[in-house]
């Protein structure tokens, strides 16, 4: 059951722009899910995301195994002036389903 996804915002994105200039972020996310009986279980997923500088990205979690609803779990961004680091920001309000993020590196 794949209940996580990485979404990106490509508003005003120039499709002719070269993808080779984008950084790839290698990271693992451990999420906290609830079943119908509210028993928590954990899932760890590995991702590779293509990032653009100065954009905020969001990892979403599924509210429950039976639900189609999603909540924002954690936000991260890569800054144009330092492409070797990623800023991780927990969601300020609401349920935070993100237990842990392991950053393996940016290339």
Residue ranges of each PLM-predicted region?
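Surface-exposed ligand/attachment interfaces on beta-rich extracellular proteins
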Residues: 1-23, 32-44
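Generic beta-strand hydrophobic packing signal
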Residues: 22-25, 101-103
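A short beta-strand element within beta-rich, extracytoplasmic domains
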Residues: 23-33, 84-91
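Short edge-strand/loop segments of extracellular domains
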Residues: 44-53
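Extracellular jelly-roll beta-sandwich "head" domains, especially the C-terminal globular C1q domain
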Residues: 6-10, 38-43, 56-107
